[in-house]
């Protein structure tokens, strides 16, 4: 399949791209940084997902994975607005098979920085919107929401673990759609209730 992934130069995005390449898919990456992947089936576009005028002209994407994200003053612009633009540009079309948004456990818990958790909360709502709109193509759209703190399992998720989830949700799954899948090692169930003073 023809797979477009944003944020592929490092971390989760790079691991996802490599996982798809290892399964013989054609992968296109978009990232502000130079490519960290050398593979005959990989094409890299170095540009900012927020720079709408300079995004590459790519057609007939079958799998779209919105991974590009940040934790700084550009949270809303990168994590939400650019994700929406990328999806509307490349994902809402008849050739689409699956769209996956990389969210965050923070969207469920409200933890971390205000703008960050708000941007990821927007991703959850938008995921459901897209799932309804691409159902007519027989396509799915879900959000994969990793945790980012020390969890009850007392370990961190690796980028490779998240890549396996991404592959399952886009390539194996055909029926789960509009869902926000928490892969957080129990972060969201490690809830500490606080009584009012």
PLM region spans:
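N-terminal Rossmann NAD(P)H-binding glycine-rich loop of SDR-like oxidoreductase domains
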Residues: 9, 17
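Conserved active-site helix of classical SDR/Rossmann-fold NAD(P)-dependent CH-OH oxidoreductases
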Residues: 18, 84, 121-128, 132, ...
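Conserved NAD(P)H cofactor-binding loop of Rossmann-fold oxidoreductase domains
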Residues: 67-72, 186
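Catalytic loop of short-chain dehydrogenase/reductase
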Residues: 98-122, 127-136, 148-149
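Short, small/polar-rich loop/turn modules that mediate ligand/substrate recognition or access, typified
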Residues: 135, 140, 176-179
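Conserved SDR Rossmann-fold cofactor-binding beta-strand/turn motif
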Residues: 140-150, 182-184
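C-terminal substrate-recognition "lid" of short-chain dehydrogenase/reductases
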Residues: 159-183, 188-189
């Amino acid at each position: 399949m023809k797979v477009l992934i944003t944020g592929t130069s490092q971390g989760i995005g790079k691991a996802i791209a490599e996982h798809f390449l290892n399964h013989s898919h054609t992968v296109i990456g978009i990232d502000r940084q130079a490519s960290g992947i050398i593979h005959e089936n990989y094409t890299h576009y170095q540009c900012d997902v927020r720079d709408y005028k300079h995004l590459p002209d790519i057609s007939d994407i079958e799998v779209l994975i919105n991974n590009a994200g940040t934790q700084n003053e550009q949270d809303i612009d990168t994590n939400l607005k650019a994700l929406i633009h990328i999806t509307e540009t490349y994902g809402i079309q008849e050739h689409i098979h699956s769209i996956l948004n990389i969210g965050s456990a923070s969207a469920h818990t409200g933890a971390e920085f205000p703008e960050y958790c708000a941007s990821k909360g927007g991703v959850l709502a938008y995921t459901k919107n897209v799932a309804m709109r691409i159902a007519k193509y027989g396509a799915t759209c879900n959000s994969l929401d990793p945790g980012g703190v020390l969890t009850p399992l007392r370990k961190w998720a690796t980028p490779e673990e998240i890549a396996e989830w991404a592959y399952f949700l886009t390539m194996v799954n055909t029926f789960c759609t509009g869902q926000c899948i928490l892969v957080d090692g129990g972060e969201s169930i490690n809830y500490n209730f606080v009584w009012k003073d």
